[in-house]
Curated annotation (Swiss-Prot):
Belongs to the bacterial ribosomal protein bL21 family. Disulfide bonds: none annotated. The keyword Ribosomal protein applies. It comes from the Bacteria. It comes from Wolbachia sp. subsp. Drosophila simulans (strain wRi). The gene is rplU. This is Large ribosomal subunit protein bL21. InterPro entries: bL21-like, bL21-like_sf, Ribosomal_bL21, Ribosomal_bL21_CS.
């Protein structure tokens, strides 16, 4: 069974037991979160679209890899280099359930 969930403006394909990195969620480590924005859920070829929830455990709150932003104007000696690290949450999918 797998599901497509939406969180942080992005969509993720998840299965039970899978580990994903999502945009920062306001939850403590080792706590369980419930994601209600399930776009579709599929079980052995049968697909459903609503009344589903995904329960996940927060494994870690951390920061992602550094993104380098480099700006330059040729022949003008103009160079700017900055970096950015986004806050992310690491989740383990525990349960995909379909409510009836």
């Amino acid at each position: 069974m797998f599901a497509v969930i939406e969180t942080g403006g992005k969509q993720y394909l998840v299965k039970e037991g899978s580990i994903i990195k999502v945009e920062k969620l306001e939850a403590e480590e080792k706590k369980e979160v419930e994601i209600n924005k399930v776009i579709c859920i599929s079980n052995n070829g049968l697909s459903y679209s609503s009344n589903a929830t995904v329960k996940a455990e927060v494994l870690e709150q951390c920061r992602g890899e550094k993104i380098i932003i480099f700006k330059k104007k040729r022949r003008k000696n103009y160079r700017r280099k900055t970096g950015h690290r986004q806050y992310i949450t690491v989740l383990r999918i525990n349960e995909i359930s379909l409510q009836k």
